[in-house]
Amino acid sequence: MADDTASASEDATRSYYDTHDVDAFYDAVWGGEDIHTGIYTDEHEDVAIASRRTVERAADTVAGLLGKESTVLDLGAGYGGPARYLAERFGCRVVALNISEAQNERHRATNAERGLDGLIEVVTGSFHDIPFSDGQFDVVWSQEAFCHSSDRERLLGEAVRVLEPGGALVFTDLMAAEGASVEALRPAVSRLGVDALATVDFYRRTLTGLGLRRIDFDDHSGQLLHHYVCVTEETRRHRPELRNTISPAYLDSLLINLPLWVDAARREQLRWGVFHCRRA
Ligand SMILES: C[S@@+](CC[C@H](N)C(=O)[O-])C[C@H]1O[C@@H](n2cnc3c(N)ncnc32)[C@H](O)[C@@H]1O
């Protein structure tokens, strides 16, 4: 059971992702598969295509470790887009841990439709208390989930604990720029159920302290502005049909919150990219 700091953000996240409103929004705007920042190669590209490219790039960093005999743990697995990609590309087993049972139900159903339920196990639980024993996984993977944690030192400790020696931790996360004002970002960040984002320096320092080596950060911060402009425009474009599927209050709150992320990205107050490192 997580302590109070971690469990406050867990409750907020669970109730956020378990609502029908949030489910319908991610389905309409991201395609309900990958829900993280995209890497765009063309300004007219769909959010879903760019978001899939992020999975491909992150997977390239651990391709040498993955095959039919390996197992990946995906922390905060969402609807399972990354888990299915990894299982299909490498034939590896994936354990997908996620706190939202509503997402997990959809995740399991999609895996079964695609014949991937034999390779992917979907588990309900929190990355603050990973329900597996030490050193079990070849790769621990996560995309845009650590931003929901109010105890990131604890979750990183857990991620490293379950990684086998020589295994890799790879993750993407929304972060604050060094020196960005926590107060100024708070109105945007509050939608994630936390007070503040991590920084690149925090991750480097904490991962080093946990004994990880070859810590690399592929900096794609320049993608954030375009991504949030696209997501905001898509939300506005889908507004008429979203009005029929999600509550007006949630839609209005999104249309207030998303432009705050656009503004923060424009002011270069945010960072984003792919971290990858190895356990000694
Ligand atoms: C923005 S979504 C990203 C989903 C997925 N990783 C992807 O990229 O498509 C964030 C995910 O983190 C999960 N999450 C947040 N806090 C969590 C926690 N404490 N333990 C496990 N999962 C958590 C949410 O339920 C959600 O699925």
Question: What are these regions, as identified by a protein language model?
Answer:
Residues 1-26:
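N-terminal auxiliary segments of SAM/dcSAM-dependent transferases
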Residues 32-39, 45-68:
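Conserved alpha-helix/loop element of class I SAM-dependent methyltransferases that forms part
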Residues 71-73, 81-129:
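Class I SAM-dependent methyltransferase SAM/SAH-binding core
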Residues 128-139:
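A short acidic, Gly/Pro-enriched loop at the edge of an enzyme's catalytic core
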Residues 153-168:
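A short glycine-rich, Lys/Arg-flanked "PGG" loop and its adjoining helix->strand segment in the class I
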Residues 174-195:
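Short, glycine-/aromatic-enriched active-site segment of Class I SAM-dependent methyltransferases
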Residues 195-211:
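Short alpha-helix
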Residues 216-280:
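Conserved Class I S-adenosyl-L-methionine
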